[in-house]
Regions:
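Short glycine/proline-enriched turns and hinge-like loops at secondary-structure junctions
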Residues: 78-80, 153
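Repetitive beta-architecture junctions, highlighting loop-to-beta-strand starts
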Residues: 31-33, 42, 80-84, 92, ...
């Protein structure tokens, strides 16, 4: 599943300032972003690549030529954990902005200079931190306390792996 971050949905975004189209495709069996010239239809280049996938576009800064997106399967560990990345539209320089090995939910400030990063795993309760636009942690906003749950006898789930037939 891919979320273009646009109300109309779809697997593409038009970049009006550069007359380009950003297109999501699984042409190599992995979900990645490609940049096309909107006038000629010529592929200008891949924006992302590798054995992982882009899941959701969060924002595009056409002036800076940068794109923020959620991806999964790139970092070691659980391939379903979602991380926030930033990538250059022209150079493909990829930066991981949420390094903790967990599933991340992101909320940007109106200025986009900061974002809240709420992350957790099936066995680790949610933590919310404030990060600057480059992903540096500024402060912990909240840590979920599950001590009352544990004291009542509740047990954490036990992760397991099952080998697939294929």
């Amino acid at each position: 599943f891919f979320d273009s971050g646009h109300e109309a949905g779809g697997n593409w975004r038009f970049l009006s300032s550069s007359n380009e189209v950003l297109w999501y495709s699984q042409r190599d069996d992995w979900g990645h972003l490609y940049l096309y010239d909107a006038e000629t239809g010529v592929l200008k280049g891949r924006v992302t690549e590798g054995e992982w996938q882009v899941a959701e576009i969060i924002r595009i800064d056409e002036g800076e030529r940068k794109l923020w997106f959620i991806g999964n399967g790139r970092e070691s560990g659980d391939p379903y954990f979602r991380y926030l990345y930033r990538v250059g539209l022209d150079d493909g320089e990829l930066e991981l902005l949420t390094p903790d090995s967990a599933n991340h939910t992101i909320s940007f400030s109106p200025s986009r200079a900061y974002f809240l990063d709420s992350y957790s795993t099936p066995v680790d309760p949610p933590v919310t931190v404030l990060r600057d636009g480059d992903g540096a942690e500024i402060m912990t906003v909240q840590e979920t306390d599950i001590s009352a749950l544990l004291a009542s006898g509740w047990q954490l789930p036990i992760p397991f792996s099952v080998k697939a037939r294929d």
